[in-house]
Regions:
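Generic structural signal for individual residues within well-ordered alpha-helical segments
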Residues: 243, 361, 501-504, 612
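Beta-strand elements of modular eukaryotic interaction domains
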Residues: 197-200, 230, 237-243, 525-526, ...
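Short glycine/serine-rich loop/turn segments
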Residues: 201-347, 537-554
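Short amphipathic alpha-helical segments and helix-helix/interface helices
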Residues: 239-242, 294, 412, 515, ...
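Electropositive, surface-exposed helix/loop patches at the edges of structured domains
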Residues: 284-306, 344-345, 349-351, 462-486, ...
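Structural helix-boundary/capping segments
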Residues: 2-18, 306-405, 409, 414-417, ...
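Amidase signature
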Residues: 1-201, 369-561, 630-635
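Extracellular/periplasmic catalytic domains that process cell-envelope and extracellular macromolecules
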Residues: 199-203, 246, 298-300, 384, ...
Length: 635
C-alpha cells in the first residue's frame, strides 16, 4: 500500500520524499519525517487484525512503562511525555498499541475504545493489545505505522538562523549515519527512543550538533571549504569526541557551519558557506569566529541541548560571549583530538556550548572520564573545588562599556563572598617584567608579540600545504582559498624554523608563568585537578559588532599578546558565564536593544571538572543565571 493523502486522517498529509531517506509529513501545524526503514514489523499473526489501520501516526506503550495498561495510567504517562518530548503530540493518539509480554505468543486483541475514555477523548480510534512477537526492539513513544511496520518519527525544525551545514540521522538498526545536505531544516528524533539516563548512558537522549571539523563515520568533512569537501572521502570512523558522546547516549542531529579551515573571519568574509545569524539583540550582530555555527545553533534552538566546537585561539570563548551562552574550552590535551581537522597541535582543543550550566557540567564530566592523564581528575571529594585566589587583570582589557564593567565587578564581589577571599588586582605586564622569564626585562606585549601568530601560522601551513598538493594532483587545478586564507598562507610561508623553535619556547615560558605567577597553582601542594587560583575578566564585546561591517583585508593573525589569549597560550580550561545584558542603540532598528554580558574564568590545566563544579555551586548559591533562553535575549 502506498500512502496518499485520501487514506490518511484529515489532519495528516504526506508530502512525498524529501531526500530519499525520510518522508515529510504534516501533523496539524507541525512537520515530521519518518524513517525510511522500519524499526519493527508485525508478524503475519497480527497483520489481519491491524489491516483496518491505514498509514497513521500512533503511540506504543510497553508494559515496563505502564504495567496495567489502565486508561488513567496511559493518559498520565502520555501527559508526561508531552512535557519531556517535543516530538510527541496529540496527533499520535489516533492508533494505540499496547505491547504485553504476558500474552501468549501470536495473540492480540482489538480492544473497545470505550474502555479507554481518556484516550478516546484524545482522538484514539484503535486500541490493540498484542504479544511482543518481534517487537522487543520497540520502546514506548510515538511512531508512524504503515503496512504492518513501525517507523521512527522525527520532528522537522527550520534552521532559521542558517547554523547547520547538514542534518544527520542515525539508522536505528544499522547504526549508520545518514546525512541531508544542504539543508534548511533539521529533523530530530523523539527523546523517548533513548533509554533513561543511567551510569552507562549518562547523556542518553541529549541532542547535539558537531562543528564540521570533526569526522563522522561514513560522511565527508568540509572544514568549511567546498574544495576540501570535494577532495574528502567518507570517513571510516568518527572523531574521538563524537564517538565518546554517542557511546554515552547523546544523539547527533547535524553538523554545523564553521569558517573556512576554522580560521577567524568576519561575516562578510565567508564565501564557501553562508555565515550563521546570531539571534541576539537586533539580529544583525557578528556570531564571532570559526565556531559560529555551534554557538548559533545553541543560542537559537530550544530543541538542541549542546554543540561541540574546536578552539585554536578563541573559537569557543568568542562565539559563546557574543551569543550569551555557556562555553567551555577544554584544557589543551584533556581530550584526544583524533579525527579532527587541526590548525595547531600546540593550541587546538575541543569545546562545548550549552544554554545550561547543569548540562555543561554533566557533558564535560562524563566526556573526560578515562580519556587522558590530563583529563582524569580524582573524585571531586578529594580535590579543591573552591579557589583560594581570584585574579582580576583590570589593566589588561578595555573598559569601553560601563554596564559591562559594573556587572563584572558585582560578579567578582559575589565570588569574593562565596570563596571567602578578596580579589587580587593584577597588572599582568608588570608581573611579567618583574618575573622576567626571558631575562630581557621587556614588556609582555613586546616579548610575546609574535608568539600566538607564529603558532597559528605554522600550524596553518602544515595543514593547508599537503591539502593543496593533494587537490592539485587530483584535479589539476588549485583549490579555492578565500581572501583571508590566501593572505594567511602568504604569511605562513614566511615562518622560519627559528620562528617555530622560538614560539614553542615562548609558549612554554608563558604557560609556566600563568600557572605559577598568575594562578599560583603549581606549588605542589594541591591534588591534580584542583582549582587553586582562577582568573576572571569580562569577555563579551563591549560594543555592538554588526555583521554588515566591511572589514579591511587582513589575514586575521594576532600580532600581539592579549589577556584573551591566556587560555590557549597556557593550555588552560576556560568557561564563559553569562551574567547580564547591556543596553545599546541599534543602528539597524533605530531602537534601544540589549546584548549579553559574560565573564571569562580560567583555571589551572586539568581542572576542567573542578572549575565547572565550582561555577555551578557558585551560581546556585548566589542565584546567578543557571540557564539562558534561546532567541533574542538571554533572559
Amino acid at each position: 500500500m502506498t500512502a496518499t493523502s485520501p487514506s490518511l486522517s484529515p489532519h495528516l498529509a504526506m508530502m512525498g520524499l524529501s531526500d530519499g531517506w525520510q518522508s515529510v509529513i504534516r501533523l496539524d501545524e507541525r512537520s515530521y519525517q519518518r524513517s525510511q526503514d522500519p524499526v519493527a514489523r508485525l508478524s503475519d499473526d497480527f497483520r489481519q487484525l491491524c489491516s483496518e489501520i491505514s498509514a497513521s501516526p500512533c503511540l506504543v506503550f510497553c508494559a515496563d512503562d505502564c504495567p496495567e495498561f489502565a486508561d488513567s495510567s496511559l493518559c498520565e504517562l502520555f501527559s508526561h511525555w508531552l512535557t519531556i518530548d517535543d516530538v510527541t503530540s496529540v496527533s499520535f493518539c489516533r492508533a494505540v498499541f499496547l505491547l504485553d509480554p504476558s500474552l501468549e505468543s501470536g495473540t492480540a486483541e482489538n480492544m473497545s475504545k470505550d474502555s479507554f475514555p481518556g484516550l478516546r477523548d484524545l482522538g484514539t480510534t484503535n486500541v490493540i493489545r498484542m504479544a511482543t512477537n518481534g517487537l522487543q526492539g520497540l520502546r514506548s513513544g510515538p511512531y508512524f505505522y504503515q503496512e504492518a511496520s513501525f517507523h521512527h518519527m522525527y520532528r522537522v525544525f527550520p534552521d532559521s538562523q542558517s547554523a547547520f551545514f547538514s542534518a544527520i540521522a542515525q539508522n536505528p538498526i544499522s547504526g549508520q549515519f545518514i546525512e541531508h545536505r544542504p539543508t534548511d531544516h533539521v529533523a530530530v528524533p523523539s527523546r523517548l527512543y533513548s533509554p533513561p539516563q543511567n551510569s552507562k548512558l549518562p547523556l542518553s537522549g541529549l541532542r547535539f550538533a558537531s562543528k564540521d571539523v570533526f569526522d563522522v563515520a561514513g560522511l565527508k568533512t568540509s572544514a568549511g571549504s567546498r574544495s576540501f569537501f570535494e577532495l574528502s572521502d567518507p570517513k571510516p570512523k568518527s572523531a574521538f569526541i563524537v564517538q565518546k558522546l554517542t557511546a554515552l547516549g547523546a544523539v547527533l542531529v547535524g553538523k554545523v557551519k564553521n569558517t573556512q579551515f576554522a580560521n577567524g573571519e568576519d561575516p562578510q568574509e565567508w564565501i564557501d558557506y553562508r555565515c550563521p545569524w546570531n539571534p541576539r539583540g537586533d539580529g544583525y550582530q557578528n556570531p564571532d569566529t570559526s565556531s559560529s555555527g555551534s554557538a548559533t545553533a545553541v543560542s537559537s534552538y530550544p530543541w538542541l541541548d549542546f554543540a561541540i566546537g574546536s578552539d585554536t585561539c578563541g573559537s569557543i570563548a568568542c562565539p559563546a560571549a557574543a551569543q550569551g551562552i555557556f562555553g567551555l574550552r577544554l584544557s589543551t590535551g584533556a581530550l584526544p583530538h583524533e579525527g579532527a581537522f587541526t590548525i595547531s597541535k600546540y593550541l587546538d582543543t575541543s569545546g562545548i556550548f550549552t544554554r545550561s550550566i547543569d548540562i555543561l557540567h554533566l557533558v564535560t564530566s562524563k566526556l573526560l572520564e578515562g580519556t587522558s592523564e590530563l583529563g582524569r581528575s580524582p573524585p571531586l571529594s578529594e580535590i579543591q573545588t573552591i579557589p583560594s585566589r581570584i585574579v582580576y587583570p583590570k589593566s589588561s582589557f578595555p573598559h569601553d562599556n560601563d554596564e559591562t564593567i559594573e556587572s563584572i565587578d558585582r560578579f567578582i564581589k559575589a565570588l569574593e563572598s562565596f570563596c571567602s577571599t578578596e580579589r587580587t588586582t593584577l597588572d599582568i605586564d608588570e608581573e611579567w617584567i618583574k618575573t622576567d622569564p626571558h631575562g630581557h626585562k621587556l614588556s609582555i606585549y613586546s616579548e610575546l608579540k609574535t608568539t600566538t601568530a607564529h603558532l597559528h601560522l605554522a600550524g596553518f601551513y602544515d595543514a593547508i600545504e599537503p591539502f593543496q598538493k593533494a587537490y592539485r594532483s587530483t584535479y589539476q587545478k588549485n583549490p579555492y582559498l578565500d581572501r583571508v586564507n590566501t593572505e594567511k598562507l602568504k604569511l605562513a610561508r614566511l615562518v622560519t624554523i627559528e620562528d617555530r623553535e622560538k614560539m614553542v619556547r615562548q609558549k612554554a615560558l608563558f604557560a609556566n608563568f600563568a600557572q605559577k605567577q598568575i594562578l599560583q597553582s603549581s606549588d605542589g601542594s594541591g591534588a591534580a585537578g584542583s582549582l587553586g587560583g582562577i582568573m576572571v575578566w569580562p569577555f563579551n564585546p563591549q560594543q555592538p559588532q554588526y555583521r554588515d561591517n566591511q572589514p579591511p583585508l587582513t589575514p586575521h593573525v594576532n600580532w600581539r599578546w592579549d589577556v584573551d589569549y591566556t587560555a590557549p597560550l597556557a593550555g588552560l580550561p576556560q568557561v564563559i558565564v553569562p551574567i547580564g545584558q547591556f543596553r545599546y542603540e541599534s543602528r539597524i532598528t533605530g531602537e534601544p536593544d540589549f546584548l549579553p554580558i559574560t565573564a571569562s574564568i580560567v583555571g589551572p590545566p586539568g581542572s576542567d571538572i573542578a572549575l565547572l563544579d565550582f561555577v555551578s555551586k557558585f551560581l546556585i548559591r548566589t542565584r546567578g543565571l543557571l540557564s539562558v533562553k534561546p532567541g533574542r535575549y538571554i533572559v
